[in-house]
């Protein structure tokens, strides 16, 4: 629970920091109170992950390589795929497609890490813990993957990329949606095999390149 309290504390700092920044920055994104409440709610699900047959936050059966390094590298690989899609499918010249990249650094680092934590709570911790504890925990505990897991994983993978639906060429929207559907399915597998910190590490690897570093480049070159 101490690890989760650190994650919750990070989100609280992001919530406060965004409201202390000067308001003149265009497209400033705030970490909302609703998101903070969801992360707080996740605190009560953490002790029950084992009832769903899922690894605990620091499960001793999971190596640090599988918990942090491997998913982080996979996340970076997906960010590179996003960048390739962005490069080969031309964007409209309105400058409105990527407002989330234009967060001021270092606030962007604080905000996007908090956003990653929030998304992992709402698309991994809460739905998987609640539904699998009711439907599929015996099979997961026995080393089998129940149908309930695939259903929850697919539903979350369909819902999670909705934020990518923006004004852009249809080819780019379809490409990004498919990439992030696959991204979320792989995250679900990391969560099943290595726990919440593994799926979070994958998203952080993706966010580091796609949002934070690319956002810094856009901030300093536009």
Predicted regions and their residues:
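Juxtamembrane helix-loop-helix connectors linking adjacent transmembrane helices
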Residues: 26-29, 51-116, 132-141
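Alpha-helical transmembrane segments
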Residues: 1-15, 70-78, 150-159
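Alpha-helical transmembrane segments in multi-pass membrane proteins
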Residues: 1-49, 102
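Transmembrane helix-loop-helix hairpins at the membrane interface
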Residues: 105-222
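Non-cytosolic membrane-interface motifs at loop->transmembrane helix junctions
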Residues: 24-31, 96-102, 169-181
